[in-house]
Amino acid sequence: MASAEWLNLLETCPQNSYLDGIWLIAVHIPALMQNIDTLTLNRHSTTTAAFTVALVSLDARVGAVGTALDNWLEGYQHEHNISDGLGLYWSSTALPHSTNIALSPTIDFATKTVASMMMTYWTHKLELAILREDIYVLEANPEGTDANDRVGAVIANAYDLASLIIRSATYWLANENVSIHVCMYMLIYPYRVAWAWFARRSKLYAEEISACRNIRARLLAGGFNTRLSEFVLDQLYKGPPE
């Protein structure tokens, strides 16, 4: 879906109709997923600058989903004449603010469930993109200053991705503790990327595998869903596709 279409959809979303808000979210989410898939699959043939531009576009689409969800919740509150109730942690800017919205248990549960599924899917897509970027850097230029500089850029990108996820998490997750958990989870990425690079340079594959599996075990112990971690680790061992 083109950016202009996204903007047109946002502009036509009624502020006082939560049903239209639900429809808009249903339109945005599939396009967002497609954008993530394209970004991940094309990572190996994309320059760092182009990838950064793609991330900015992705961030805008995440914002569109958040705006649509905001409209839906505000419409629900307006149509049902609700002015107080369940306090949800919500953010449309870098600084969060509180909004009191009363939701039925069914709607509240469904919203959190869908949000958690999307967050898990997106997190692992980005994890795969980060690890693949590190691999392609090594294959392209395993020696020299240029390789070191590019690996440094990869680690910086990991922090950028962490910031992107943390900001976007507040759109989808109505639980501050979950957002904090995502933040802590993302802090592991720079370590993983750096360790993967040093492990490949020094052929320490056993230590690399052990470190990644230990991290995954700690994440599982913390309750974070890492169903795709084995697939991600497999990609790390295999290197770039043919």
Language model feature labels by segment:
Residues 117-119, 124, 182-184, 189, ...:
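Start-of-helix signal in alpha-solenoid helical-repeat scaffolds, especially tetratricopeptide repeats
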Residues 1-140, 148-163:
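Central/C-terminal regulatory/activation regions of fungal transcription factors
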Residues 74-88, 137-145, 174-180, 203-206, ...:
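Structured alpha-helical bundle/scaffold domains in large eukaryotic membrane-trafficking regulators
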Residues 4-12, 92, 108, 143, ...:
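Intrinsically disordered, low-complexity regulatory regions with latent secondary structure
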Residues 15-18, 22, 41-44, 81, ...:
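Residue-level signal for secondary-structure boundary elements
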Residues 164-174, 182-202:
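Hydrophobic/aromatic-rich effector regions of fungal transcription factors
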Residues 128-133, 141, 183-186, 219-224:
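Long amphipathic alpha-helical coiled-coil segments
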Residues 65, 72, 129, 168, ...:
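Residue position in alpha-helical solenoids
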